[in-house]
From Swiss-Prot:
<feature type="binding site">
    <location>
        <position position="22"/>
    </location>
    <ligand>
        <name>mRNA</name>
    </ligand>
</feature>
<protein>
    <recommendedName>
        <fullName>Cap-specific mRNA (nucleoside-2'-O-)-methyltransferase</fullName>
        <ecNumber>2.1.1.57</ecNumber>
    </recommendedName>
</protein>
<comment type="function">
    <text>Displays methyltransferase, positive regulation of the poly(A) polymerase and transcription elongation activities. Involved in the modification of both mRNA ends and in intermediate and late gene positive transcription elongation. At the mRNAs 5' end, methylates the ribose 2' OH group of the first transcribed nucleotide, thereby producing a 2'-O-methylpurine cap. At the 3' end, functions as a processivity factor which stimulates the activity of the viral poly(A) polymerase OPG063 that creates mRNA's poly(A) tail.</text>
</comment>
<feature type="binding site">
    <location>
        <position position="72"/>
    </location>
    <ligand>
        <name>S-adenosyl-L-methionine</name>
    </ligand>
</feature>
<feature type="active site" description="For methyltransferase activity">
    <location>
        <position position="175"/>
    </location>
</feature>
<dbReference type="GO" id="GO:0044423">
    <property type="term" value="C:virion component"/>
</dbReference>
<feature type="binding site">
    <location>
        <position position="66"/>
    </location>
    <ligand>
        <name>S-adenosyl-L-methionine</name>
    </ligand>
</feature>
<feature type="binding site">
    <location>
        <position position="97"/>
    </location>
    <ligand>
        <name>S-adenosyl-L-methionine</name>
    </ligand>
</feature>
<feature type="binding site">
    <location>
        <position position="95"/>
    </location>
    <ligand>
        <name>S-adenosyl-L-methionine</name>
    </ligand>
</feature>
<keyword id="KW-0507">mRNA processing</keyword>
<keyword id="KW-0808">Transferase</keyword>
<keyword id="KW-0949">S-adenosyl-L-methionine</keyword>
<comment type="similarity">
    <text>Belongs to the class I-like SAM-binding methyltransferase superfamily. Poxvirus/kinetoplastid 2'-O-MTase family.</text>
</comment>
<keyword id="KW-0648">Protein biosynthesis</keyword>
<keyword id="KW-0506">mRNA capping</keyword>
<feature type="binding site">
    <location>
        <position position="68"/>
    </location>
    <ligand>
        <name>S-adenosyl-L-methionine</name>
    </ligand>
</feature>
<dbReference type="InterPro" id="IPR000176">
    <property type="entry name" value="mRNA_MeTrfase-like"/>
</dbReference>
Length: 220
């Protein structure tokens, strides 16, 4: 793949002004990866999102609920960065998998080893009553194969919609990927937000981060 030079990289989906025909074979390509590329991608996306909240006075004093956070190596560096700026943030990291030990013993970080469902979200809402919640979701179930199936994706999106509806966060950053054309099952709803492109994404990627900078009732 040839590099493309531009004055400013595309940041959002609606900035893309061209298109390619879908070719199922492109998903079989194995692009070269940097060491820890996945964690670096998350670091860049979440630093952008949280910095914007900080500039608008939303971040200080908030509770960040991060669902699907493991291993979360990059979160330690996000936490240290905003702590050095004097911001008071409580982090609640939730995943059924184990987190990186680098996150152990941090007084402002709570690690919860659990897969999330609607009933747990309702319990969490009661525990965080009157807290200013910022929601980050990187839920990604996979029932076999190298990539999540369309049914996995739809289940994840339904759960994310439930999280936003119940927690009523001041802002949200939600992961989602549009099913490929030959894997489409049915139409679905996602919250209306700013559809940000992800760093290092291959040309066939249909994955974005949906950033919502408002606590107003969601629009699907």
């Amino acid at each position: 793949m040839e590099a493309v030079s531009m004055d400013k990289p595309f940041m959002y989906f609606d900035e893309i002004d061209n298109e390619l025909e879908y070719d199922p074979k492109t998903s079989e390509e194995k692009p070269k990866k940097l060491p820890y590329q996945g964690q670096l991608k998350l670091l860049l996306c979440e630093l952008f999102f949280l910095s914007k909240l900080q500039r608008h006075g939303i971040l200080d004093g908030c509770t960040i609920v991060y669902v699907g956070s493991a291993p979360g190596t990059h979160i330690k560096y996000l936490r240290d960065h905003f702590l050095s700026m004097g911001l008071v943030i409580r982090w609640i990291l939730i995943d059924g998998r184990q987190h990186d030990t680098i996150l152990n013993g941090l007084r402002d970080v709570t690690l919860i080893t659990k897969f999330v469902d609607e009933s747990y979200i309702r319990v969490l809402k009661k525990q965080l009553y009157q807290s200013k919640i910022v929601l980050i979701s990187d839920v990604r179930s996979k029932r076999g194969g190298n990539e999540p199936s369309t049914f996995d994706l739809l289940s994840n999106y339904a759960l994310q919609n439930i999280m936003v509806s119940i927690l009523k966060p001041a802002a949200s950053s939600l992961k989602w990927r549009c099913p490929f054309p030959d894997q489409w099952v049915k139409d679905f709803y996602i919250p209306h937000g700013n559809e940000m492109l992800q760093p290092f994404a291959p040309k066939y990627s249909a994955e974005i981060v949906n950033n919502i900078y408002s606590g107003n009732p969601i629009k699907l």
